[in-house]
Amino acid sequence: ISGDFAAIFDPNTLNQDLAIYNELPFTVLFVDGNHENFTLLNSYPVSMWNGGKVHIIKDNIIHLMRGQVYSIEGKTIFTFGGAVSVDQYRRIENVSWWKEEMPSEEELNEAKENLLKYNNQVDYIITHTCDAITIRNYLAYFRGKVSEIFMDNEMLDYFETNVKYKHWYFGHYHFDGKITDNKTEVYNSFYELR
């Protein structure tokens, strides 16, 4: 899941919100989006899993943390969740909006260090939002309007210009569509990583 997992949001309904995922016959992996309860999400202990840091929510529900590279079924997957909420003005801090939605410089630096261990080459990149280059060059054609560019998008430009990858998946813009030969916006669809 490429962000806005949102099942870890209300502590009072947490078990109910996770129930649908508990019943699935596979492990659910997700990067955080901007609509997450980061206080609750970050209350889970940090563990190492397949080469990178994670929050294990349940045995079959795992949060892939920002700036990590995982080896899964012979593939390398780099993750970097988070995004800016364009509707912050109508949300309440630490109730319906958390400042941790925006990736930090520390997370970016950790990402750069981890990617260097793989010579800046991975099979897949999974983020919540996308880089500013993609917004400027492609997203307007799919959404019928130009999306605003925020600091998080510019932060992700580093990965576009410095990392070799086969495919990049992101989910912030709430539609399904192949943007380029190697970039896909994911909303309700499933894609097999081959």
Outline where the language-model segments fall.
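Short, glycine/charged-enriched secondary-structure capping and boundary segments
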Residues: 14-17, 43-47, 92-94, 139-142, ...
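Active-site neighborhood of phospho(di)ester-bond hydrolases with catalytic His/Asp-centered motifs
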Residues: 1-4, 27-35, 64-65, 80, ...
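Active-site environment of divalent metal-dependent phosphoester hydrolases
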Residues: 6-11, 34-40, 70, 85-88, ...
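Core catalytic region of metal-dependent phosphoesterases/phosphodiesterases
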Residues: 1-72, 145, 149-156, 161
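Short glycine/proline-enriched coil/turn segments at helix->beta-strand junctions
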Residues: 24-28, 73-75, 120-121, 164, ...
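Active-site-proximal loop/helix segment associated with metal-binding centers of metalloenzymes
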Residues: 52, 59, 73-151
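Binuclear metal-dependent phosphoesterase catalytic core
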Residues: 69-73, 144-147, 157-162, 173-194
